[in-house]
Amino acid sequence: TEYARNYLTTYGQQYNYDTLLHIAQAQEQQIRALRQMAIAANHQHFFVDTEMLVMQVWCEYVFGNCHAYIIEQAQQQQFSLYLLCKPDIPWVQDGLREYPNELQRVELFHYYKSILEAQQLPFIIIDGSYEQRLPKAIQAINTLT
């Protein structure tokens, strides 16, 4: 679950710096619950769309600053693999999505990539058409088992 979507759908698309802290805290609770469910069900993998690195980039990109809580959680979280989607497909409005400008999308891609590299986190770039992306993601995930 992506808590930000639920929040913005419920309360409106206007948000501020402190709103992002609330969203991050709720998202972190959902991630913990999802992890526990995956462990209890003996699943090898579980998938998270929005985690604390996303929240960190969102805060820094929009507000030029980030809450200490988000940074601390981002540094402590552990995931086996990040799937970093390259912005080489058309942007599609979904009612909540921001940054239709290609330059901003590329800038954000490089921002995420630089953080992943700086923290030496395992990631793969998912690019190409919609049809090409899913097999690439599946292949990358299959290397984990």
Regions flagged by a language model, labelled:
Residues 1, 48-50, 85:
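Active-site flanking residues adjacent to catalytic metal/cofactor-binding acidic residues
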Residues 1-28, 32:
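Conserved substrate/cofactor phosphate-moiety recognition/catalytic segment
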Residues 7-10, 51-56, 87-93:
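Short, basic/glycine-rich phosphate-binding loops at helix/coil junctions
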Residues 21-78:
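Glycine-rich phosphate-binding loop used to anchor ATP phosphates in small-molecule kinases
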Residues 22, 26-29, 111, 136, ...:
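Alpha-helical elements of Rossmann-like donor-binding domains used by nucleotide-donor carbohydrate transfer enzymes
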Residues 62-132:
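A glycine- and Lys/Arg-enriched "phosphate-lid" helix/loop adjacent to the NTP-binding pocket
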Residues 126, 130-145:
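Basic, glycine-rich
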